[in-house]
């Protein structure tokens, strides 16, 4: 099959959150047996991207706020074709130093219009797979009866909380026809459109990234017109849980670790624990944490409202009260939250057991996965989550809120601990206390939790197989 993946993130070329990881992992796995091309907008931060082979270069026109010119360079990249599209006559839209900015709807709709024009001239694809609201306009553009692309369209919701509300006039500035434009419009306000709503109606199949998240989306009434769209498309909507690249995330070969190990040491638990403790000792020395404090609980996360920052703060208090170590590695574009955590960072700078690292450092994060005994993921919403899968592979027990993919992958008493009520700090604190007590007093139970996590199948092959089966069913 020829499969085209379209997204605005692709790790490691451009990454902000889990979207880039998910798109890259799926694309690379599918490319082992299929012809895969990834379309990505050009950002200044990837201007130095190079590849051993440029496959093609082309210029073309697209329609968005007038007739515009774009160019596309296709590279051979890790078994697939990576095509970077530059909006030459609207270059200012992607001139920012960050991936996301205030005019995201305009920027990404322009990219979608250019991608549609590119696909109309490219080798025909069997499947065009769109990732999240950013490229939602592309679903309607590809259905244009005057110049249709005869590919089956799959749309994946990675985060239902972000939907792409915009003016209908903006979308009409592309080549979308009136019929398909109507799918994007809100009935209650025809001057407003929603990129995700149109993508739901214009795609041949919709997926999201976990089974529980499907039900959470169906039960989300925050916008009744989006809810109606989900119900209308429910027969072609399912969840396929993400996986992780087990070659990239491998404690046996990870160069960021002070001491490497893997699941084969589960038969020698003393050796396994010693290796994790050696990583912890190196991390403690690096961050100036006293060796008197253990276990070590970590948070590795963006600091945004949906990730539960209030619970991150609560861990600090709990760690002080119960004399264990806590490390937070996180970034935030929310100035209010960032300032709150910077103030905490300053206040805790001399703490013997608490460290807040407010920038993302991949080698440090990897070492922390290995050194930590537990990782806490207190998200209000988490479509799938890769953090808990990575942590379990590194022998680190997840403490999570029972939501989305966290609920599907972390089973209390089997491979982790859970809480549910976001309005109940007592339940959250009880989970922390239970986990710390189990670590300190029940080593056999703790080993079983680690074993279940390390042996869990979290690779990409199962995810890719589900998608291949879906693609084939659409083509049959």
UniProtKB/Swiss-Prot annotation:
Residues holding ADP-alpha-D-glucose: 15
One Pfam family recorded for the sequence: Glyco_transf_5
Biological processes per GO annotation: glycogen biosynthetic process
Pathway: Glycan biosynthesis; glycogen biosynthesis
Record flagged with keyword Transferase: yes
EC number, UniProt record: 2.4.1.21
Keywords, sorted A to Z: Glycogen biosynthesis, Glycosyltransferase, Transferase
Entry superkingdom: Bacteria
Reactions catalysed according to its record: [(1->4)-alpha-D-glucosyl](n) + ADP-alpha-D-glucose = [(1->4)-alpha-D-glucosyl](n+1) + ADP + H(+)
UniProt GO molecular function: alpha-1,4-glucan glucosyltransferase (ADP-glucose donor) activity; alpha-1,4-glucan glucosyltransferase (UDP-glucose donor) activity
InterPro entries attached to this UniProt entry: Glyco_trans_1, GS/SS, Starch_synth_cat_dom
EC top class named in words: transferase
CDD domains registered for this protein in UniProt: GT5_Glycogen_synthase_DULL1-like
HAMAP family listed in its UniProt record: Glycogen_synth
Role of this protein: Synthesizes alpha-1,4-glucan chains using ADP-glucose.
Annotated family: Belongs to the glycosyltransferase 1 family. Bacterial/plant glycogen synthase subfamily.
UniProt name for this protein: Glycogen synthase
Taxonomic source organism: Chlamydia pneumoniae (Chlamydophila pneumoniae)
